Amino acid sequence: MRALVSVLASMLLLAAAAVPAQDRGREQAAQALSHADARIRRDAATRLGEIGTMADLKVLAAALRDPDDDTRDNAEQAMWRIWARSGSPEVDGLYQQGIEQMGAGDLRQGIATFSRIIALKPDFAEGWNKRATLYFLAGDLRKSLADCDEVVKRNPYHFGALSGYVQIYARLEQYDRALEYARRALDINPNLDAVRRNIEVLERLQRERRQRMI
């Protein structure tokens, strides 16, 4: 009995030590994002993509303004990787299934899969984001807009959802709102070249509309 108790105690100690070790790894990677050596910053951003959590989005968002191109790219990819982790093996499996359905252009099944994900884990922002994308592709702009609202409630750093608003409001010819969200997206991620181009187009459309009203 004593031996069993000793083994169980050792297992509990190992389990308790594992969590702080991962936390330390995250903290070290976050600190390394401010290192003078760009190579270390790049690796730190990649590492956070592997082990980071939503709590690391603030430092990764700051790294989107790093002077090094690769560090910025790695930080952006790290954020997407963190967003794609739900914390539930069942939901992660469904998420992968939904991604495959999106890739195959199966909008109806994709919407059904992400709706199931949302029902199982409503706090998982990326489930809402992917369904918003599918609704947009299906032409249901109002539902897409509503899902984007749910994304940013849960993840205010989600420049992808903010970019989605731009596309939706542009389709609705609400150019002022589209420009508002384009600027918000760039405030978080200044590397969104497509959004910058959208701003140029939207400003032109806005001017043309004003001229027609004169």
Where are these regions (language model features)?
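Structural marker of alpha-solenoid helical repeat scaffolds
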Residues: I51, D66, L120, R154-N155, ...
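Amphipathic alpha-helical scaffolding segments comprising HEAT/armadillo-like alpha-solenoid repeats
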Residues: A21-A32, T53-L64, S88-Y95
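Terminal, low-structured helical/coil segments at or just beyond the last alpha-helical repeat
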Residues: Q97-E100, L179-I214
